[in-house]
Curated annotation (Swiss-Prot):
Family of the protein in this entry: Belongs to the GrpE family.
Name of this protein: Protein GrpE
Quaternary assembly: Homodimer.
CC annotations in GO: cytosol
Gene: grpE
Purpose of the protein: Participates actively in the response to hyperosmotic and heat shock by preventing the aggregation of stress-denatured proteins, in association with DnaK and GrpE. It is the nucleotide exchange factor for DnaK and may function as a thermosensor. Unfolded proteins bind initially to DnaJ; upon interaction with the DnaJ-bound protein, DnaK hydrolyzes its bound ATP, resulting in the formation of a stable complex. GrpE releases ADP from DnaK; ATP binding to DnaK triggers the release of the substrate protein, thus completing the reaction cycle.
GO biological process: protein folding
GO MF term (any one): unfolded protein binding
Amino acid sequence: MEEQKQTPSTPTPDTAAEAAVNAATAAPETAGADDVAAQLAALEAKAREHYDMYVRAVAEGENIRRRAQEDVSKAHKFAIENFADNLLPVMDSLQAALADGSGDIAKLREGVELTARQLSAAFERGKIVELNPVGEKFDPHRHQAISMVPSEQESNTVVTVLQRGYTIADRVLRPALVTVSAPK
């Protein structure tokens, strides 16, 4: 006996394009198959289009995330730039004072006062506020007590400030070093 190759009665297309070609060349009795093949090809094209849109959306999301991280990194890196720019005139004044060899104490004092005003203005622009709590109640969040001294003031009141403190945007940058009145 001779083996006969059996061929399937309907072709099995490898791709949607082959299916469309096969459907177009099929006999009229397979007109329903033509419609199905055309629908299949259209749906496969639509699926490829949606997959492409999905891949692009994922890539765009990654790009947005990366750009946001870069923006945050730059913000951290250059956050002090504006404040440093405000300090440059103070440095210029100090360098001018050091370069002055006249020895005139009154002129030097005037220059130091001007420089202190420049520094205060730079602090103000940077929202740095000086803490000078003489006469206030002791606040451990804003003051650091160095010692207790006998005083006529109420107990736990700041008597003297040894070193001024500073806040920046209502956050303590450095607490004020103070002496506090002792209980009577």
